[in-house]
């Protein structure tokens, strides 16, 4: 890509990113026209291709930028410093809300990109997220204390159940247009409280 993109004002960079996230989250990779992205960003198609040489490069840049934004925001929120699973979830939720207020279509883009089948990009997307997904699906990497949970609970199964419930929620909502941030936050708080009631060990 052309490094001059990073010399643009932050507001213009964000407008281009948001235009890409919006168009790609609503269409397949193949059916997402760069002209529509340029229009949404308020720039010409030729200028968009000045910064990104082709659609594939722009698509993969959006994917990597999403990972960068997410990791930085999670670090700022202290998610990697917590050992309490549900406190980590609450902090992660607040981080997700912060991100979505800046980039409204970013979560829908991630879901769409993960399931994208176009051979032009799917191999690189899957390779990129393999390590990330291995961590997210593996409760053993989170240093969970069995004493905090109901006796005999399979922590790996519990964590996978919560992971797939969250992913399924995002997939379902993304199929019906733009995700509502406030609604998503309320729904996830309810899910976390439900999980706490059924999985945490009760005193006495």
Predicted regions span which residues?
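Helix-turn-helix
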Residues: 15, 23-57, 61
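Short amphipathic alpha-helical elements of helix-turn-helix/winged-helix folds
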Residues: 19-23, 99
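Gram-positive cell-envelope targeting signals
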Residues: 1, 45-50, 107, 165
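Hydrophobic alpha-helical connector segments
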Residues: 61, 76-102, 155-162, 185-188
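N-terminal intrinsically disordered/low-complexity leader segments
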Residues: 1-10, 203-204
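Generic hydrophobic, amphipathic alpha-helix propensity
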Residues: 12-20, 37, 62-70, 136
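Hydrophobic/aromatic-rich alpha-helical bundle segments in the mid-to-C-terminal region
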Residues: 111, 122, 144-193, 202-204
């Amino acid at each position: 890509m052309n490094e001059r993109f990073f010399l643009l004002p932050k507001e213009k960079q964000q407008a281009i990113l948001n235009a890409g996230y919006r168009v790609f989250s609503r269409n397949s990779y193949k059916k997402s026209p760069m002209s529509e992205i340029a229009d949404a960003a308020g720039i010409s198609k030729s200028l968009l291709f000045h910064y990104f040489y082709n659609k594939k490069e722009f698509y993969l840049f959006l994917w990597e930028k999403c990972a960068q934004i997410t990791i930085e925001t999670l670090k700022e929120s202290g998610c990697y410093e917590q050992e309490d699973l549900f406190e980590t979830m609450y902090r992660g939720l607040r981080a997700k809300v912060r991100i979505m207020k800046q980039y409204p279509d970013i979560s829908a883009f991630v879901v769409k990109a993960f399931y994208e089948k176009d051979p032009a990009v799917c191999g690189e997307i899957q390779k990129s997220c393999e390590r990330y997904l291995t961590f997210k699906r593996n409760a053993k990497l989170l240093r969970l204390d069995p004493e905090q949970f109901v006796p005999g609970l399979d922590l790996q199964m519990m964590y996978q159940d919560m992971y797939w419930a969250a992913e399924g929620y995002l997939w379902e909502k993304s199929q019906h247009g733009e995700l509502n941030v406030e609604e998503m936050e309320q729904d996830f708080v309810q899910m976390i409280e439900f999980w706490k009631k059924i999985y945490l060990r009760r005193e006495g």
